């Protein structure tokens, strides 16, 4: 059977995930990964806003940075009761989940997160979970796993048009398609190119 390439894989329905977050509210555990890091950060911001409507503070927000993850520090962050807000939020960045020592200890922690806490594992665009590992299997059974993929061409075209409009420019369809052909289909790569084109375009309309 032929292996699917990145363009053939199922695309994440980002608007649907935002609606789900709004309707269901924050879950206890999230695993965010995938190549589309711009959308990942946008989703993280929305999730954090739902958990901490008044913003980050030292009582209800904790951030742990990888590649190592100290179990006691993790437990302490999760067990800290939120202050002046309903939920606490623990952001864990770029931990080597595929290489954690004594993974069973972390499996126990991630499987027993209190109702008032949301833990979010945020992985780099290069991360790929090893589905053979017990820790990854456990995470997938208890976490809301979101893989942020490149978006469909139609969605990207609409997004490019909106980005140019925000900069006071309109853009021809052919110009938007050419931009994607040259810069690729990752939003983080398209944004600086859109900004440069909008800044140097002489007229109000960007053409191919």
Which residue ranges define each predicted feature?
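Conserved beta/loop motifs at nucleotide-recognition and modification sites
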Residues: 1-208
